[in-house]
Amino acid sequence: MKNLFLTSSFKDVVPLFTEFESNLQGKTVTFIPTASTVEEVTFYVEAGKKALESLGLLVEELDIATESLGEITTKLRKNDFIYVTGGNTFFLLQELKRTGADKLILEEIAAGKLYIGESAGAVITSPNIAYIQTMDSTKKAVNLTNYDALNLVDFSTLPHYNNTPFKEITQKIVTEYAGKSQIYPISNHEAIFIRGKEVITKRLS
């Protein structure tokens, strides 16, 4: 059964995560910061890592852009959870496809492993990421030949909805894609819980 926790900003929804998954102490996480490595603003990477560690989780970092397929395979398979940070979604997708990590992640999720997707990590679960090019630059993924993504859900998660500095951009995307694809906007204080075919959006009050 599919277990996905999708968010815009993990550090801002930690109570929602512990509601979604309570058995955390001593569990291990493969932490993938790859999307952030081509960005200038990266504070959310350390913030996400610290939030995980504060819950008693053991974090093992994996940059899929620089590791061998053997190392990627080992880390994805041995740890209990998979966490993919924010950053540039197109670069992330390019590296997932180039290394074959996309298929490995799908295999692990199909086997029941919990996937935590933050911002770009949530966007790549969509069928196709073309909708996010208003927010993310495609120029950081010159070798990406198409925008077909992990296709784990039948909607397109739009992170940071109505949050600074993305307020205008996110509203523009919602307007632009109205009727074309199912855009699922979430703010920094919301998360999407997915268990099997059940999809629930929750918000911190």
Curated annotation (Swiss-Prot):
Report which superkingdom the organism of origin falls in: Bacteria
Some GO term, biological process aspect, for this entry: which one?
A: proteolysis
What are the TM regions of this chain, as residue ranges?
none
Q: Which residues form the active site?
A: S119 (charge relay system), H160 (charge relay system)
Q: Report keywords, A-Z.
A: Hydrolase, Protease, Serine protease
Q: Is Protease tagged as a keyword?
A: yes
Which EC numbers characterise this protein's activity in its record? 3.4.21.-
Q: Gene3D superfamilies this protein is in?
A: 3.40.50.880
Does the UniProt entry include the keyword Hydrolase? yes
Molecular function in Gene Ontology: serine-type peptidase activity
The record ties this protein, via PANTHER family, to: ALPHA-ASPARTYL DIPEPTIDASE, PROTEASE S51 ALPHA-ASPARTYL DIPEPTIDASE
Record family assignment: Belongs to the peptidase S51 family.
Specify the protein name. Uncharacterized peptidase Lmo0363
Recorded source organism is: Listeria monocytogenes serovar 1/2a (strain ATCC BAA-679 / EGD-e)
